[in-house]
Curated annotation (Swiss-Prot):
It comes from Ureaplasma urealyticum serovar 10 (strain ATCC 33699 / Western). InterPro entries: aa-tRNA-synt_IIb, aa-tRNA-synth_II, aa-tRNA-synth_II/BPL/LPL, Anticodon-bd, Anticodon-bd_dom_sf, Pro-tRNA-ligase_IIa, Pro-tRNA-ligase_IIa_arc-type, Pro-tRNA_ligase_II_C. This is Proline--tRNA ligase. GO terms for cellular component: aminoacyl-tRNA synthetase multienzyme complex; cytoplasm. Homodimer. The gene is proS.
Length: 472
């Protein structure tokens, strides 16, 4: 077993402190003097770049083009859409002064960019021939969060926001669902995080949306994390910002809109779904180092460097890290465990005498002696095995933790066991708030299922099978 660094707190001791110690020890985040504003260190940014590259590739398959919007929005523009301004007003960072000049119309630092995209679309769309228009930007946004935690609630966070306009409601709504499917496929197949797809309740929708589609993931402590959302915005923004096109009937019509986003919050999900008490466990597809080549006292055995170079050349298709320092092998392994490297290759004199190296799997800690001639094929197979194993482990926990309930008492019991519940629910926002007071759980999403039953809270007949959980 590799050396365990003392600074990592175990999950059983305190899950929140464990999370923070993982973030710190894996060199993901550095705090600054401004609450909620954090440095994304190279390890974290490499994960985000891998996420960004794959999502961007998928978006392009659906005709989405990237652009960049300004950071500032005149406050007067926010006030054109009542629901939107009410939804974001408490979170706005404001620019009230430039130099020594006070502004009559202050600027808001974008918390999201619907308004910017609306003004852009208004200026470029004329007729139905211009539609659809699908754009995305990768940027940071700022929201004044009362309580901040790395990745989960940053005052400034990085994300992508996709905005698109269409001639019809059907097209816009279907594209919102398509993008949710893109997120679902990516999060499950690349990040190895099983998710639950569903529709947000009206009171949990994005401000100004008619529908909000979501994917919810379960963390190891039983809490849900909203991992990505896609919204059908209807014509609310189009009417507020006068986005019209000339239809085939030669009449002017308002466009139908959608938007969608996935943020660096997903890195928090990666940690809380996969990591253990030794550190990160990163899926091979997005690990910043997929393989670490660790020589054992190469300073005393120079031939190990020659073999390590041969291994590096043979595995050049992978993201590699090498450590040939005189640090002990236990320390080297512990550092790679913390940083979540899927496979470590130990290059030592004893093994090389038999033309072998030792592979150490991060997910199971298993050590495997491998002949050098079989190294490349074994690595390929192991990376696939690791990917499958960490997904199946998370999927098993999710499946075993969703319990159907018929009463508020059953819901209390399930939530107290750090599980999630599903129940037929046809209550109101006020009912949901009361349930949260009683159980600490709230509605996360409505399942996309056609069955019906009796609401566990109001006794009404309903087809809304709903997920309840504590949530981040």
């Amino acid at each position: 077993m590799a050396k365990k660094l003392e600074k990592i707190i175990t999950r059983n001791e305190n899950f929140a402190d464990w999370y923070t110690s993982i973030v710190n020890n894996a060199k993901l985040i550095q705090y600054t003097d401004i609450k909620g504003m954090m440095v994304f260190q190279p390890n974290a940014w490499a994960i985000w770049e891998a996420i960004k590259n794959q999502i961007d590739l998928e978006f392009k398959k659906h005709g989405v083009r990237n652009l960049a919007m300004p950071t500032l929005i005149p406050l007067s523009e926010f006030q054109k859409e009542k629901d939107h301004i009410e939804g974001f007003a408490p979170e706005l960072f404001m620019v009230n002064q430039i130099g020594d000049k006070k502004l009559d119309n202050p600027y808001a630092i974008r918390p999201t960019s619907e308004i910017l995209f609306c003004n852009y679309f208004k200026n470029i769309v004329n007729s139905y021939n211009d539609l659809p228009i699908k754009n995305n930007q990768w940027c940071s946004v700022m929201r004044a969060e009362k309580t901040t935690r790395p990745f989960l609630r940053n005052a400034e966070f990085h994300w992508q926001e996709l905005h698109a306009i269409f001639a019809s409601e059907h097209e816009a709504d279907e594209f919102a669902k398509t993008i949710l499917d893109v997120y679902t496929d990516f999060v499950q197949n690349y990040l190895c995080i099983p998710v639950i797809k569903g529709l947000k309740t009206p009171w949990e929708r994005f401000a100004g949306a008619q529908k909000t589609y979501t994917i919810e993931a379960m963390m190891q402590d039983g809490q849900a994390l909203q991992s990505a959302t896609s919204h059908y915005l209807g014509q609310f923004f189009a009417k507020a910002y006068d986005i019209k096109f000339q239809g085939q009937d030669n009449q002017m019509h308002y466009v139908h809109q959608m938007s969608a986003g996935l943020s660096t919050r997903i890195i928090g999900a990666l940690i809380m779904v996969h990591a253990d008490d030794q550190g990160l466990i990163l899926p091979p597809d997005i690990a910043f180092n997929q393989i670490a080549i660790l020589s054992i006292f190469a300073n005393k055995n120079p031939q190990l460097l020659t073999i390590s170079e041969q291994i590096r050349n043979e595995l050049s298709d992978y993201r590699l890290f090498e450590d040939h320092s005189d640090k002990g092998v236990g320390y080297k392994l512990a550092q790679q465990e913390i940083e979540g490297t899927p496979i470590c290759i130990l290059v030592g004199v004893k093994e090389l005498a038999n033309q072998q190296v030792v592979l150490v799997r991060r997910d199971t800690h298993e050590k495997i002696n491998v002949n050098l001639i079989d190294l490349k094929s074994t690595i390929k197979k192991l990376l696939l095995d690791i990917k499958t194993n960490i997904y199946q482990k998370a999927k098993k926990q999710l499946d075993e933790s969703i319990v159907f309930v018929n009463s508020i008492e059953e819901l209390k019991q399930v939530i107290a066991q750090n599980k999630m519940a599903k129940a037929f629910f046809d209550g109101s926002k006020e009912d949901d708030e009361q349930i949260k007071l009683l159980t600490n759980a709230s509605t996360r999403c409505i399942f996309d299922e056609t069955q019906s039953g009796q609401c566990f809270y109001t006794n009404k007949k309903t087809n809304k099978l709903t997920l309840f959980a504590r949530a981040y």
